Amino acid sequence: IGPENGVFAIVDADQITQVFTNIVKNALQAMQGRENSDIIIILKSHIKNNLAICPDIHTSNMNWIEISISDNGPGIAHDVREKVFVPNFTTKNTGAGLGLPISKNIVEGSGGKIAFQTSDAGTTFFIYLMKA
């Protein structure tokens, strides 16, 4: 994440682009056929505060960047929530079920964390990366 906004993260640019692509692609698929579909991406800079979605970050002395990607799709069904990061798991007719597992590996391989919150009003993925 770069100089355009003055916030720098420790992550490979090509890899984090793949993470964003995977999450946004899933969001677009989830909202397919819905009117007034929105995807909102927010970047926040944190110093160990307000990170309730990923509490183990609180124990770290690092400063974090939070990127949230939200959609207003139908949300992730209860019975699949624990499987979204499992390789080869998919609820779709096409695809290999690798987008979110690859995203998790990239984020965690960069020393970060990925988590999500979901309801019938939509889903938000949270990506936490160490500030450079």
Task: Report the location of each language-model feature.
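Acidic ATP/Mg2+-coordinating residue in the GHKL
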Residues: 71
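Short conserved segment of the HATPase_c
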Residues: 62-64, 76-88
